[in-house]
Amino acid sequence: MKTEIFPVTIFKSKVNGNEILKQNLVQPILDSLDELEIPEDWTTNKIYTSFEQEKDFIENNKDILLNNYHHTIDEFFDDQYGLHFTDFWYNVYLDGEYQEIHDHLYSKLNHSHFSFIHFLSYDKDEHRPPEFSDPLRAMRYLSLEMDSNRCGEVYIPSVEEGDLLMFPSYLQHCVLPGKKTSKPRITISFNAIVTLYGDERRIY
């Protein structure tokens, strides 16, 4: 008998009304690119991001986005749940942009449990999906796991426009450089602290 233990799970489903969101949000996002700056602690020099800026745009559209996201997120949880959303931002990739490997553990005290990526504008023939890294990569080198050694060190999900990914915030991931294209790759990302799961409640 062989038993695989301690899985790492990511979730994926479609966002309702993505086409309407795309029609309403893509152009305002593209119009803001000249105002965006790359955060100082990011390695990439070829990405447009609203991280740490453009908060008014996000705040003005957060309720609309969450109304569409909640139905999708409901599919991910197997019991009653509550979430406190801590960050919202968008990234735009146009000309070979990339995102270095990173996680979403920004706070030492109130770190998020789950992170999300919504592929608002995405062409799977033109754009690169995120790549997730095995969190036990270094430890696996200390042992022989036979079948597990053929699993590779990264997982690349198959994503389409309108998909929403949910994954543990500690899970490191990156986006490899894409090719030059006239089609913008636009994602909306956000983090969440779980405040209720089943009968357990966290006061936040």
Locate predicted features.
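Non-heme Fe(II)/2-oxoglutarate
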Residues: 1-81, 98, 129
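A short glycine-rich, His/Asp/Glu-containing loop-to-beta-strand
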Residues: 84-92
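Catalytic core of non-heme Fe(II) oxygenases with the double-stranded beta-helix
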Residues: 94-166, 198-203
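Short beta-strand His + acidic residue motifs that chelate non-heme Fe in jelly-roll/DSBH
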Residues: 100-104, 173-180
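A short hydrophobic beta-strand segment most commonly corresponding to one strand
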Residues: 114-118, 182-198
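Exposed beta-sheet edge/beta-hairpin loop segments within beta-rich domains
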Residues: 155-158, 177-181
